[in-house]
Amino acid sequence: MSYYLSSENHLDPGPIYMRENGQLHMVNLALDGVRSSLQKPRPFRLFPKGFSVELCMNREDDTARKEKTDHFIFTYTREGNLRYSAKSLFSLVLGFISDNVDHIDSLIGFPEQIAEKLFSAAEARQKFTEPGAGLRALQKFTEAYGSLVLCSLCLRNRYLVISEKLEEIKSFRELTCLDLSCCKLGDEHELLEHLTNEALSSVTQLHLKDNCLSDAGVRKMTAPVRVMKRGLENLTLLDLSCNPEITDAGIGYLFSFRKLNCLDISGTGLKDIKTVKHKLQTHIGLVHSKVPLKEFDHSNCKTEGWADQIVLQWERVTAEAVKPRETSEPRAAAQRFYGKRSRAEAPLKCPLADTHMNSSEKLQFYKEKAPDCHGPVLKHEAISSQESKKSKKRPFEESETEQNNSSQPSKQKYVCLAVEDWDLLNSY
């Protein structure tokens, strides 16, 4: 009987009878329930009870889908049919290199035309905004192409960009124009020390208006030029206006800029202005201008080069980071109820610069052009002896005056260096 209960494929033998206590019982009726339960197998589960299946046939990875379609150009015909053509091998290789531009060893000797296309492709893929990799990629281009990447940089009132992207800004080389007006740098800022490096010796126009500079900052900026004849030796335009901590002693450090043609020291802490005017004219030939010079209207300095859009992108990112959140309706209603005015979201200006420009005289200097040495040709050959004598005396007197004037700066060639100057020079 146990064999029958355990076997499932056993043939039915028919009714089975059993006698018990003098009574005959049929065993098949009692085993019908057991047999039915044995003949029904338990359902088999292929997956566990909490398992679920999701079809992902149309949900591919974005990078994989881009790799599949990036090699083709899709266009439409006149009939409206979709037509695709393969991209050139140059564009495919250019895209691959731009995706891995931070792994390039060097670009020195690479053609400029191809490098500009590579820079644009990397910029379109936003490779220069990636932390770490963007700085390495930018340094590869600046080391090889210098002023082509950026020849002029305007960061006027962009102190947030300077604080966030200082290393990227320091990577630019061979700049000719640099505008750092209204950035509140101070004497100890790292960027002010970077101005004296050889990488920025090509700067000819430097705007440092309203940067909290003092005589110590001017001394630090001019030390390499005064002693080692390097640094900002090619400077032709300098704007130091609206720095009240610069005094008469600080102006004396500027005499080392022999190529300086335009200087603005309006709004500084000068006491003896008449003496300063005389020294500037005698030492470097700068004359005080009675009218405002157009060189200091900040319209000529603009960001120019391959990386001009990158600088604009930095400005947008920093502006969005400090943008105030939108006030909720209950808060706005409460402000209206209590009569509070919302803050105006206007760009910050230079209040110090405006006050100095309105209150004090503009001290802008320029270098006069040398007069033409070739005078008009005399028509008459007969010249009186008196006129010839006068003409001979004049160049002789002029030569004597020139010798006297040249002897004065020759005596001033030997500059006494302070201990702070030697400490600064030893740091290079």
Swiss-Prot record:
Disulfide bonds: none annotated. The modification Phosphoserine is found at S406, S407. LRR repeats lie at residues 149-170, 174-195, 202-222, 234-255, 259-280. Residues 379-412 are annotated as: Disordered. InterPro entries: Leu-rich_rpt, LRR_dom_sf, LRRC42. Belongs to the LRRC42 family. This is Leucine-rich repeat-containing protein 42. It comes from Homo sapiens. The gene is LRRC42.
